[in-house]
Regions:
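Outer-membrane beta-barrel translocator/channel fold
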Residues: 494, 513-517, 534-537, 669-718, ...
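Outer-membrane beta-barrel initiation region
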Residues: 488, 546-665, 669-670, 749-780, ...
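Outer-membrane beta-barrel "beta-signal"
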Residues: 762, 866, 920-921, 951-962
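Beta/coil-rich, acidic/histidine-enriched accessory regions frequently appended to metallopeptidases
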Residues: 18-29, 205, 232-350
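C-terminal outer-membrane beta-barrel translocator/porin domains of Gram-negative envelope proteins
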Residues: 677, 688, 735-892, 902-904, ...
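Acidic/His/Gly-enriched intrinsically disordered linker/tail segments
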Residues: 22, 108-113, 121, 126-219, ...
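Juxtacatalytic substrate-recognition/specificity segment
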Residues: 13-146, 246
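A flexible loop/linker signature enriched in serine peptidases of the S9 family
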Residues: 173, 313-322, 337-342, 355-370, ...
Length: 962
């Protein structure tokens, strides 16, 4: 089963679409002998800078592997605040979300992206060899995707993190927070015989992700064997993919080890190193007295008054929300749920300000950072209209200030009328903003080529350095009473620091066992913070009574990281992009217009069988026939298409194709089929059927999906219209004559047929749902409503179909239980009907048919159906067959269905209501195969229902994470 699942996973994952950018963007491209950069004209400076870093990294980015990076295009997406990067086949490209990450370290974002994502291009090139390369000639790029199964995902990401770390002065994996979760867990990581939890994740407790795990194993192995052992693993796998377990075989063959041994040696060594460090005790005291029932994260505690602290709280059972904590009793009060918070909240005069990630109404790749506020006494979050690019809202004595980010890569401090405006220099990122009441100035946290530093905005609109740039990560800037408060890793741990604005001195305030974050002064001589342990991040407080001076340094102390082998690669921290470099780049590599119409098609794959890739994605239906298929997707992810030729004995030759385009916000689709047997719609079995001709059909459709993101709640409205034509033969039922005496049609054999069948469909759908918690599998509250109307505009004898549907989601009787109820109604209107009132020519909706029945068991005459389901988790086994199959969660659904419709009983000579029903259950098994990470969790569903007609009905289906 595991092998079949992986094959199905690849089949679906290879047709992944990143989502379209806004239609208003105008695209350009720069080509070099090694790469192509595709970018909107608004991001021209970002593209030039990124290209410069690519060229600087290229000579050493392949270190440890025998082959360098693929020649691959880089596609820039500048309007998405959810910073990320991705390397894909089908077609091959590197996707860059260029907005700098909010929570970042001391290397500029574009350098981080280049070091990490370009390393993936190296891995892919080393996997695309041998037999895998041969598959690419047979199957196109989808053949190359098979190679991705030959290195585990945790290693692919871990090796990329390792390169990102090696190409910086004090990079990602050296940050104390990168090992903090493992340090807090301690020996618990080695306490389980089955180690798959640490690869596959958990619904019961926190497990660091595969980036953290992969780096630790990769870095240990690199130091232990004095070489990149994954080069030989990739080399062996690409030439022997039929062995399936190629990683295990190669590790045994070349290094006499295996993944389990590497895991054990890695964490035995790490725990030995960490246990030898001097013991540290938290200097802060936890504020909340609430019991910790699951892994919990408090963030950004702020003093409301002397008795209350406001904080964001998230746990495995509930999504993010504001809570107040009584500082005396430790009791909590929930205030309001929020959406996905992008930057820290600020509080002043009874009002809370913060920002949230919110998708635009039309375009998937336009994700904004929306300015929000809430009056604390009312507890109702609201959005500030028009403020969609805001970061770090900060109340001042002249109004609200915030950081504004533009898609061209520039940051600025701006705000309400009267607030000093300052535009940051090019190539300078802003990662914090604070207002100090004593000095009446705005202060900021910046990152540039020199590292991270603190600055002040002067009354004349200029900026002053308070500290020099250093490769020391700073975070969570706040200010009060003449001091700046922030997180710093200068000591080798994540600790709370302050900067005295009067003396220009920096001090460390906290001492932590694992780490402390998000400081803010409470005005009562204390500093609030969050402090980490194995149960999560806790809201905490300590007096400001111990100031430990911090000496300026270019690098932090390296305390928690054991020695690892240093690679001879470029340090991107030393690479600068100057005005002269920009001029030189423009002279060597001219930017040209990138025409979207001319690049609508990019055939990346083919196969010697006929399949419909859209059905693979939409319906999980893999129908393979003899033939050939071409698959296309453009580099902007706005157009997908396929063309297939199939042959089968029953229909002969059939050609099918379809094109989907979503670059305008409206999703457009056209499709066509030619070949096979003409469809015949007879008025009855007694009507003679002619010899069918070749079948053909054309269809076109448009969907307008509108997303109304409102924080905790998301609403969606979808409007659809579709037209379909086929050359089907339709009985001329208007010519029928009926004999009342014999209750029969007298001329059925002579009415003939009419060629051509049109279908026009209109639909509207609306949904309203809330965010899910980590352990939720269905939205706990929400509903779905839809209605559709189908008609044949050219044949009055066809009945129209009207259909409505509704579904309600509610919580069950225990946490993470779900009770859902659904109902539908459909009926045929107009058209030709026999004396019994039944339509010969009508449409039918297959939505909500009692389980155990199908559409042949109902008709559309006053059809009503309802269903009731109750789903709950029953077990979190977290075990299985080590390294092969990991069972993460088992769920049970109990369901009952009911349906009824009108049908004419010819024996009784009257119309009756026929009723059907079924009841039973579904068993859901959430699992991972071959130590795939949490993001690759799949679901097996086994359904068993007893319908009112027939025997026991059962089915099995597989839900994939793509």
């Amino acid at each position: 089963m595991a092998a079949l699942l992986l094959a199905a996973t690849v089949a679906r994952a290879q047709y992944y679409s990143w989502g379209a950018d806004a239609a208003s963007l105008r695209w350009r491209t720069i080509r070099t002998p090694d790469v192509q950069v595709i970018f909107p004209d608004t991001a021209g400076a970002i593209a030039r800078r990124t290209l410069h870093f690519i060229e600087a990294a290229r000579p050493s980015i392949g270190y440890g592997f025998r082959h360098g990076p693929l020649k691959i295009p880089f596609v820039m997406h500048p309007e998405n605040f959810r910073s990320n990067g991705l390397v894909m086949w089908l077609p091959k490209r590197v996707e860059f979300l260029t907005s700098p990450a909010i929570d970042s370290y001391s290397m500029p974002w574009y350098k981080q992206l280049v070091a990490h994502e370009y390393r993936h291009a190296v891995q892919y090139n080393n996997l695309n060899r041998g037999v895998i390369k041969g598959l690419s000639y047979v199957l196109g790029q989808q053949g190359s995707t098979v190679g991705l199964l030959l290195l585990p995902i945790w290693l692919i990401e871990g090796d990329a993190v390792q390169m990102e770390t090696q190409m910086s002065s004090f990079g990602r994996a050296l940050q104390p927070s990168f090992t903090m979760e493992y340090r807090a867990l301690g020996d618990a990581v080695r306490s389980r015989r089955n180690i798959d939890r640490w690869f596959c994740g958990s619904y019961r407790t926190n497990v660091p992700d595969h980036y953290h795990l992969g780096y630790q194993i990769a870095a240990y192995a690199d130091t232990r064997y004095r070489e990149n052992i994954w080069d030989k693993v990739a080399w062996y796998g690409a030439r022997n993919p039929y062995m399936i377990f190629t990683t295990s075989i190669a590790l045994k063959k070349f290094y006499r080890t295996d993944v389990g041994t590497l895991f054990a040696e890695t964490f035995d060594g790490l725990n030995y190193y960490w246990n030898a460090l001097p013991a540290r005790r938290n200097s802060s005291r936890y504020l909340s007295a609430e019991p910790v029932e699951s892994y919990t994260t408090y963030a950004f505690p702020l003093a409301v008054d002397a008795q209350r602290v406001l904080a964001l709280k998230t746990d495995y059972d509930r999504p993010t929300r504001f809570v107040t904590i009584d500082t005396e009793s430790g009791r909590e009060r929930a205030v309001a749920y929020t959406g996905s918070v992008s930057t820290r909240p600020a509080y002043a005069d009874g009002r809370v300000w913060w920002t949230e990630y919110r998708r635009s109404t039309l375009f998937e790749q336009r994700v904004n950072s929306q300015l929000c506020y809430m009056d604390l006494d009312r507890g109702k979050p609201k959005a500030v209209r028009g403020r969609r690019h805001a970061l770090y809202p900060t109340p001042t004595d002249r109004g609200l200030a915030w950081v504004e980010y533009s898609p061209d890569g520039r940051f600025a401090v701006t705000g309400e009328a009267g607030v000093q405006h300052w535009e940051a220099p090019a190539q300078t990122e802003l990662h914090g903003l604070a207002w100090d009441d004593r000095t009446a100035r705005l202060y900021f946290l910046a990152t540039d080529d020199s590292g991270m530093w603190l600055g002040r905005i002067e009354p004349d609109g200029t900026a002053t350095h308070l500290t020099e740039g250093a490769y020391i990560t700073l975070s969570d800037l706040t200010a009060r009473d003449g001091r700046l408060y922030f997180g710093s890793i200068a000591s080798g741990y994540d600790e709370v620091h302050c900067y005295d604005l009067a003396t220009g001195r920096q001090y460390r305030l906290s001492t932590s066992t694992s780490g402390s974050f998000s400081p803010s002064a409470d005005g009562e001589g204390n500093v609030l913070m969050t402090t980490y342990d194995a149960e999560g991040y806790h809201a905490a407080r300590q007096p400001i009574d111990t100031l430990r001076p911090v000496r300026p340094s270019r690098l932090p102390r390296n305390v928690v990281n054991p020695p690892r082998r240093k690679w001879p690669v470029a340090n991107l921290d030393t690479v600068r992009f100057t005005a002269a470099d920009s001029v030189s780049s423009a002279a060597r590599h001219r930017a040209r217009r990138y025409s979207r119409p001319l690049h609508l098609f990019k055939v990346h794959s083919w196969m010697p069988v006929a399949v419909n890739p859209f059905k693979i994605i939409d319906e999980h239906d893999i129908d393979v026939q003899l033939g050939v298929t071409l698959v296309s997707q453009n580099l902007l992810s706005s157009a997908e298409s396929y063309l297939a030729y199939a042959w089968n004995h029953a229909e002969g030759s059939v050609v099918k194709g379809s094109l989907r385009y979503n670059g305008l916000g409206i999703e457009l689709e056209v499709a066509g089929t030619y070949g096979g047997n003409q469809v015949i719609y007879a008025a009855g079995q007694a009507q003679p059927q002619p010899i069918p001709d070749k079948y053909y059909s054309l269809s076109a459709g448009a969907t307008l999906p509108l997303v109304f993101a409102a924080g905790y709640r998301t609403r969606m409205l979808s409007l659809t219209a579709a037209w379909n034509f086929s050359n089907g033969l339709v009985a001329n039922v208007g010519k029928l004559t009926y004999d009342e005496a014999t209750h029969s049609f007298t001329n059925l054999q002579h009415i003939g047929y009419r060629e051509g069948l049109h279908k026009l469909t209109f639909g509207i759908g609306y949904s309203n749902s809330v965010q899910l918690a980590h352990r939720d599998f269905i939205t706990p509250r929400g509903y779905v409503l839809s209605a559709s109307y189908a008609l044949n505009p050219t044949n009055d004898h066809f009945s129209d179909l009207i259909s409505v549907y509704g579904k309600l989601y509610t919580p069950g009787f225990a946490p993470h239980n779900s009770l859902t109820a659904a109902a539908t109604y459909q009926t045929s209107i107009g058209g030709f009907k026999n004396p019994a009132g039944e339509s010969f020519l009508s449409y039918k909706s297959a939505r909500l048919i009692p389980r155990g029945f199908d559409s042949n068991d109902i008709n559309s005459r006053n059809y009503f159906a309802a269903s009731l389901d109750y789903q709950l988790p029953v077990w979190y086994p977290e075990g299985g067959i080590p390294s092969v199959l990991y069972f993460k969660r088992i769920r049970l659904n109990l369901g009952a269905d009911y349906g009824q419709f009108d049908a004419f009983d010819y024996r009784k000579g009257r119309t009756e209501t026929r009723r059907i029903h079924s009841f039973g259950g579904d068993l859901y098994v959430d699992f991972n195969v071959f130590r795939q990470p949490a993001s690759a969790t799949s679901t097996l569903r086994l359904s068993f229902y007893a319908p009112s007609k027939g025997g026991l009905w059962w089915s099995a289906s597989l839900g994939l994470p793509f």
